[in-house]
Amino acid sequence: MNSIPLEIITPQRKAFSETVNAVFVPTANGRVGVLPRHIGLFTALTEGEVRITYGGKDWYLAIGGGFMEVTKEKISILVSRAVHADEINEADLKKAEKDARDIISQKGKTEERTVALASLRRSFLELKVLRHHKHRQLPSIS
């Protein structure tokens, strides 16, 4: 199977850098799949789950919004955050979910509720990534 280099970069770090067989990303218009020899593309990404296929397996990351550029040579994904399943602590997620639900249920400030809703959405996404692939890990980036 053909392959293409993929890099996923956040403001803090390079979250992923490997040669892959395919990547599937969330966009405002739905999921987009990119294979080697894909036509050039530049698109905005939404918060969601990225599926990466390489080494005969699928791997998942939770990402924040950002952009993807596809060229003949490589795929570059620049996002606000990228979280591997092995970086997620389920107990912390459940606490964050409970805290967010408590804030949302109170008649507090709209701003606090908006932040809590975003936190709740991130918690659900990260929990999905964690449960989807609890026993798989992406290679470490040095």
Predicted regions and their residues:
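Acidic/glycine-rich phosphate/pyrophosphate-binding loops and surrounding catalytic core
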Residues: 83-141
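Acidic-residue sensor for enzyme active/binding pockets
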Residues: 7, 69, 112
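C-terminal interaction segments
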Residues: 38, 48-50, 66-76
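Amphipathic, interface-forming alpha-helical segments with heptad-repeat character
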Residues: 71-85, 89
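Short, Lys/Arg-enriched, disordered terminal segments
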Residues: 1, 141-142
